[in-house]
């Protein structure tokens, strides 16, 4: 096995070690830098330790330790991961990246994309679909509301969020407190937004209480009014 090592002694001549892996990353070359690097040319695996930074196209991923496979372009960062990609800013204890698309972030995950913040113990994000999945203890905070649920699916490109299991939605700006088994939030930009609550649905606004198997909350334009029209079904 042939292993090329860049050891701490080289720090006498450079503050940061880095290698460019354009020969393996196709149209999107990867640059890896760290205090120390080990590269196995047979397996194509890079092991980086200390002040690790991976840069590819418009994404920058940092952490304490990382492994990167140049052949399948899979990366894993531990010791506090921080990803910045376009309008996404994500922090977590660890992070795995697959196929330049799937991101699996674990441990106190905080993901910010535009006006939406997603938190949970683990977030799976698919960048091509702009789809995020949180399977437990999930929270999503939008412009003027917050939703918690056992499971959350966020379709960020469509401004749509589906919460399943023990759903709780609050909005201080609109004075809403609502619960249900399932909630679907549509934050349409060019249309009236709405929230559909299903299963043991209950909504409270300004002391008014509505209950039903299904409730639809139509959200008025916040710039004009904080009114919410609730339609039982």
Regions from the PLM with identified roles:
Residues 1-233:
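Mature-chain termini and adjacent capping regions
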């Amino acid at each position: 096995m042939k292993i090329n090592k860049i050891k701490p002694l080289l720090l006498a001549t450079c503050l940061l070690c880095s290698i460019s892996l354009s020969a393996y990353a196709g149209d999107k070359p990867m640059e890896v830098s760290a205090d120390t690097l080990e590269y196995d040319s047979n397996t194509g695996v890079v092991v980086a330790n200390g002040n690790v930074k991976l840069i590819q196209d418009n994404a920058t991923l940092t952490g304490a330790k990382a492994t990167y496979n140049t052949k399948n372009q899979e990366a894993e960062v531990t010791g506090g991961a921080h990803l910045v990609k376009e309008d996404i800013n994500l922090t977590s204890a660890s992070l795995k990246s697959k196929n330049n698309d799937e991101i699996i972030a674990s441990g106190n995950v905080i993901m910010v994309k535009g006006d939406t913040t997603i938190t949970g113990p683990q977030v799976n994000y698919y960048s091509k679909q702009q789809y995020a999945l949180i399977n437990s203890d999930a929270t999503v905070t939008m412009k003027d509301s917050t939703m918690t649920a056992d499971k959350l699916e966020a379709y960020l490109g469509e401004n749509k969020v589906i919460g399943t299991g023990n759903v709780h939605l609050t909005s201080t700006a609109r004075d809403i407190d609502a619960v249900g088994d399932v909630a679907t939030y549509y934050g349409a930009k060019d249309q009236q937004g709405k929230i559909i609550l299903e299963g043991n649905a209950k909504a409270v606004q300004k002391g008014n209480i509505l209950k039903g198997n299904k409730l639809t909350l139509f959200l008025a334009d916040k710039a004009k009014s904080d009114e919410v029209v609730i339609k039982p079904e």
